[in-house]
Every structure is written in structure tokens, then in C-alpha cells.
Amino acid sequence: PTRGGKSYVNFPAINALESLGNRWQKMSRDGIHDRMKMWGLNTLAAWSSTEIRQDKKTPYTLLASIWWLTGKKTPSPFRDDYVEDLCKALENSAWAKNDPYCLGIFIGNEFEWPDHFSQLVFELPDGDTTKKWVLRQIRQKYASLDQLNAAWDASFSNWDQILQHGDTTHRASAAKDIDPLYFEFAQEFFRKSKQAIEQSLPGTLFLGCRCHRGPSVLGRAAV
């Protein structure tokens, strides 16, 4: 077989074929289901094959994700095409619609949510949709750039300068206005993700996201 454009030898499959015959795939999957029951395991792992999940013998969960434009393991829910792209990714799981063995679906894998939202915002490239959204919120709070300069003890000459990538001069002051926006950012991710699920797999339970780490604001935003 091939994977990623490269050929490889599947020695476990060769051994199973020799010992079990042409029906080795079905017999191997049956053995996995039986062993899981004997060992007290009640749910298939995230990367289990589609075939073993479609056997309808052991409950499983789904996982869907899209490439985040930032290149970071954090979502970009303010992208205009976020829901559309996620719906396309969910098409791969259309076979599980209304399957009673499907416990639900996770959106995203091993997200690394920073402790502070400002930390993420300043690391994003200039022009990123999340950064643009943050800038809009800040401009709603301050009627003029002079007011912001006074609050941040800064001397910006235009609004585009205040969140520039790599500028660390006023981050401590900026964090007081940016960090409270974390809740709305996370809430938008959960809201739009659920929207995509309801469009593509209506009735499927949204299990949230799989996280490497994350602050408590995620739990509040997910409710």
C-alpha cells in the first residue's frame, strides 16, 4: 500500500492474511471489538479506522478540523469562511449521521490556548481576522486615538499601529483591554463550530475541542 505518496510494507496485515485468510480484515476487527469488551474498554480511539467504527459494535467519537490560517493551534473563528470550511471538513463524516454508536464530535485537535488572549493577539500576523476584530472592539471603547494613547501611555499616530506584530512596548497596558475579550473570542469559536455541525450533521452532539492546554475561560465560553 501507499501513504503520503510513499510505498510501505504492512507486516501486521501480511501476518493476519496468512493466519486468518482472505477475511482477515473483518476477523481482525471482530477480535478488536471482543478484546475491548473483555478489557472493559467502551469507546474506540480517535484515530480508529472508518471501517471499525462502521461495524456498529463499539461506540466512537468523531474529529473534524480545518487548517487555521495563522498556522497556530488556535482557531480563527472570525474568518468569513470559517463555517463553510468546517462544513466541507465535516463532509468526511457524513456516513455517521444518525448513527447511535456515534457519541459526538470534537472540533480541532490539541489546541494550545494561551493563558492570556493578548499573548495570542500580538503574535498573530498583521491583517489577521482575529486581530482586526480586536481592533474594532478597542475602537468602540475609545472615542479617539488620543484617548487610547492616554490610557496606554502611548503615542500612536494611527490605529493600525496599536497591535502591530512584534511590538512589545505597550503590551502590559494593552492587555487590560485585550484579555477581557478572550471570552467572546472563545464563545465565537464554539458558536460557529456548533452552527457548522448543525448544518452538516444535525443532531450530533458537539463535544467541544480537544485541548493540549487552556485557561478556565474556555469552560465558561462553551456553556
Specify the residue positions occupied by each region the protein language model found:
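Active-site-adjacent substrate/metal-binding segments within catalytic domains
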Residues: P1-D55, A64, L69-Y101, R171-A172, ...
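Active-site-proximal beta-strand/loop segments in catalytic clefts of secreted hydrolases
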Residues: W47-S49, L63-W67, I107-E110, C209-C211
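Short secondary-structure boundary/capping segments
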Residues: T58-L62, L120-E123
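Proline-centered loop/turn at the N-terminus of a beta-strand
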Residues: K57-P59, T204-L205
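Polysaccharide-binding and catalytic clefts of secreted carbohydrate-active enzymes
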Residues: P1, N10-E18, D99-A222
